[in-house]
Amino acid sequence: MSATSLVRSSGKKKALVKNANLLKKKTSPSKTSEEVSKYLIKGLNLPIVYSPSSPERADLKFLTGWIKKNHKEIQRDLLIYGAILFRGFNIGSSENFEKVALGLDPNLSEAYLGTSPRDKKTKFVHTASELPSAYPIMQHAEMSFLNKPPKKLFFYAKVAPNKNGETPITDLRTVLRDMPSHISDKVEKQGIKYIRHYDGPGASRYSLWKTKPWNEMFKTTDKKEAEKEIKKQDFEHEWLPGNKLRLINSQVGVRKHPIAGSKAWHNHSQTFHIDSPRLEYKYVFKRQKTARGLGVYLILNLLTGIKKLFSKSEDLDVHATYGDGSEISNKDIRTIVNVFWKNIQIFSWQKDDILYIDNYSVSHGRLPFVGPREIQVAWTE
């Protein structure tokens, strides 16, 4: 892929030339060592896979030592590809996963201001999401609605699903490249405005779009303590009847990589848009072709229509608009979803896989599944 092919004929988005310089290097992974093999999965552009070259090099002690010895090379590959998959190593536990993550980056964080329900496993390790297995999680950069999102993410296949349940990833630099200019220009200029509603402690309301309670997010039932973090994050807030909380904030929609300087699509517009799940499920059903998938797709379309008919957009559980407050049209959100699926990369989990992601370059999501599956996550500051 040449650099010039990444730049539109109109001459806009000059920063994408930097992206091109990174992306064109993907065709030639750095040299495989005698200890660890490096390769791309057939048909995919990412992640780059690291695997032990022999069984005796699959144990945890070897892996942590190899990471320490080759840290600079690993970071170089992460900068270029945006995602590295450690496959074939014997991890075995959440504690060992945490050790590997700390070896890759010692700046792990416990703070989580995202919307998904998660269970804590160790100091820095949580389950990736406790959302129902039939529900898709759209592509997103982790906590992109914050001023300072995590720089890196780590996913661990504690229990790999037998079928489906993949964690697709997408290069956000190519998403920005392929986004029509009438959308990308607006998002880059205005950013995205987010409106989120959180139930209070003990609430039992059911909604497909419901976030976790505010006391779980802020780890306190004291409103004054919650307000301290709200102020720190530059959120506007309003306490609503029934002990509910509304949070409003505006954030950039395109971010520069702190090291590479390359630009990437970086927002939760499709994740928080009411039409996204049903649009996403069209692709899910096309891929999985299950009776359950068809049923969920039809139900999502019905429930979305009812929700839009009887709810104001500003009262939805989660909502995203352009930065000036204008609605992201159904046509625009459909285009955004289509661009992601044009560039999405999907691989099947294997037990003990660790996926290392540059959160400023690569997004992630989740496809529906049936049966056992436990993917764990850790993230940096």
Positions of PLM-derived features:
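TRNA-binding/sensing appendages of the translation machinery
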Residues: 71-90
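A gly/proline- and charged-residue-enriched helix-loop-helix capping module
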Residues: 109-141
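Beta-hairpin (beta-strand-turn-beta-strand) motif
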Residues: 89-91, 142-144, 157-160
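Active-site environment of non-heme Fe oxygenases that use a 2-His-1-carboxylate facial triad
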Residues: 2-66, 73, 79-80, 134-137, ...
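C-terminal end-helix/capping segment
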Residues: 106-118, 373-381
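Glycine-rich loop at the start of a catalytic domain that most often binds anionic cofactors/ligands
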Residues: 91-106
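Short secondary-structure capping/junction motifs at helix and strand boundaries
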Residues: 83-84, 107-113, 162-168
